[in-house]
């Protein structure tokens, strides 16, 4: 079983390896918040080109990765995972199913 510090280090490494950047802010416990945003444009009939954004914020609290999902600035939900690797795999799948390229 990994210690909280080992899990935290693994989480930071995975965030850096997958293009997430520190937002410069922290949560109520002082944990660093990471974020990444995807943007796509599509043609909408009678309107023209429309841009959509998908944003994922992630932090680790007491060894548990927590992620929040936003679409066009609206919070979709918050999820927690048992390990940083499971969280990253879930983020990849969520972003793919939302129609964005990771």
Q: Where are these predicted regions, by residue range?
A:
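Negatively charged, low-complexity tracts enriched in Asp/Glu with abundant Ser/Thr
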Residues: 1-48, 78, 101
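Detector for intrinsically disordered, low-structure N-terminal pre-sequences
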Residues: 3, 31, 55, 93-94
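Charge-rich, solvent-exposed alpha-helical interaction surfaces
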Residues: 7-10, 14, 87-97
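N-terminal non-cleavable signal-anchor helices
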Residues: 33, 45, 57, 95-96
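Short stretches within intrinsically disordered, low-complexity N-terminal or propeptide regions
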Residues: 37, 60, 89-92, 100
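Intrinsically disordered, low-complexity regulatory segments enriched in Ser/Thr/Pro
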Residues: 43-90
């Amino acid at each position: 079983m990994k210690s909280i510090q080992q899990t935290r280090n693994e989480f930071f490494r995975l965030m850096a390896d997958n293009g997430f950047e520190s937002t410069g802010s922290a949560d109520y416990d002082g944990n660093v918040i990471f974020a990444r945003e995807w943007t796509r444009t599509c043609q909408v009939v009678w309107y023209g080109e429309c841009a959509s954004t998908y944003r994922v914020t992630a932090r680790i609290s007491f060894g548990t990765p927590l992620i929040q999902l936003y679409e066009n600035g609206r919070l979709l939900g918050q999820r927690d995972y048992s390990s940083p690797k499971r969280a990253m795999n879930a983020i990849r799948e969520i972003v793919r199913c939302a129609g964005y390229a990771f």
